[in-house]
Amino acid sequence: VCINRDFGDWQPRRGALEQVMARIRPATFVLEPGVYKDKLPPCHVVEMRSDMDRTAYEKMKKDYLVELGGAEITALTAAAVTSKLQQMAGGWVYDTVSEASDKAGVFKSYKYAHWFSTHRFDMLDEILEGNQQDNTILVYNFVEELAQLKTRYPHLWTLDDGADVVKRWNDGQIKLLAVHPKSAGHGLNLQYGGNKMVFLSLPWSLELYEQTVGRIHRGGQERDVWVYVMLTNKTIDERIWSALADKRAISEIALEELKG
């Protein structure tokens, strides 16, 4: 049942989950992490909350437009404003500018980031200092976040920095590794190089979130895993985090149904 078409919010009809589980149970074998292999260490998830001046944020939320740095930034659809609100929760927002090209009737589009708050990166500095420079994975969702990470932390590595990045990380040679959830999925083993991960912003997909955490919380990890989730109070961050928690609850119920 669609409960919010603008934002793509759906929830199962009453009894639908039980019906689906009953259909697939005969052909399903549930393998829980750590039950048939070595036990996994605990995974601690810590909410790192901060505040910001929400004047521009509330303006975008209400009017689908805001003026920053002399530019009028607009969102044409509810889906577009959702993305911009997530950006603004991080202290910045994209502005798309179109310019005429050499070909008649053809325009080129460019994205520019307008920054109005550094609260999130200031908190990231505190987290990294508190971690005593332990090897840490930084998870980003937007290119601008990666650009800012590279500016603030020149020793930062990404998975695109060479074929041996994973090996160097697992050998303890990389202090900071930036990954995107879509590039840190199934089959990537990062558990030997560190046990700490910071989500600069969150994906909407529970699978992407869990698979990203699973790069360090997996067989072979010998230390407790610490996952820091950065949230700006009274913004869409809280809604995304709540949505992930709800989806996780449904998936846990589904697993219980399959076991029954």
Tell what function each PLM region has.
Residues V1-H119, D125-D134, V227, L244-D246:
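Inter-lobe coupling linker of SF2 helicases/translocases
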Residues C2-I3, F29, D53-R54, M88-Y94, ...:
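Short, solvent-exposed loop/turn segments at secondary-structure junctions
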Residues N135, H155-L156:
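Residues that mark the start of a beta-strand
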Residues N135-F142:
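Conserved RecA-like ASCE P-loop NTPase motor core of nucleic-acid helicases/translocases
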Residues L146, L156-K247:
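Conserved RecA-like P-loop NTPase helicase motor core
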Residues Q148-T151:
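Short amphipathic alpha-helical segment within the helicase RecA-like ATPase core
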Residues L255-G260:
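Long, largely alpha-helical accessory region at the distal end of helicase-like NTP-driven motors
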